Amino acid sequence: MIKMKIVNSILLIITLALVTSCSNNMKPEDFKNTKPSLLIEEYFDGKVKAWGILQDRGGKVTRQFKADLVGSFKDNVITLDEDFYWTDGEKQKRTWKIKKIDDNNYVGTAPDVVGEASGAQYGSAFKFKYDLMVPFKNKNIKISFDDWIFKQDEKVAINRATLTKFGFKVGELTVFFMRY
């Protein structure tokens, strides 16, 4: 009986290791020749509307939102004010400060981001990695975001984010952006 539990535990650990090692290995550089080019300092300079869904690790939609974003670019820094309106009535506000380091790299901060976010832009894609303090059951927990934005045309961009905790996927976020 004990040997069977040990074997089952080992099989579970191996399975989890295999599943987590099959993670997405896309790199921003993979998109260097794609069009239309996404420069976030241009795309988010002005007003942008957003609509999004949050899914749990099984794919079930757990929350939906609309958002108003207003950005400005000055002295190599994007200030992006985000106002979220969740369908359950919750309202959230976040202000990003994203600094352009060179032609392709960025760092960003926001009050609920732990440390600095790191970003890279190539072609039509922008990747942004950060840890966010998220409200959960009357406390805040740290969730890691692996965020990708893909520009579709001059007005439309699509955002896909994988959310992880301790390296395990806990959810996905899909956002549709429209400049106006």
Where in this protein do the model-derived segments appear?
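Bacterial N-terminal signal peptides that target proteins for export
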Residues: 2-10
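C-terminal motif of bacterial Sec signal peptides marking the signal peptidase cleavage site
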Residues: 18-21
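Bacterial signal peptide processing site
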Residues: 23-25
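N-terminal helix-cap/turn-to-beta initiation motif at the start of protein domains
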Residues: 31-47
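A short, Trp-centered hydrophobic/proline-enriched beta-strand micro-motif
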Residues: 44-52, 159
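Central antiparallel beta-sheet cores of small beta-barrel/beta-sandwich binding domains
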Residues: 51, 55-136
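Amphipathic hydrophobic-ligand
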Residues: 61-67, 140-145, 169-173
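Glycine-rich, aromatic-bearing surface loops/beta-hairpins
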Residues: 146-147, 151-180
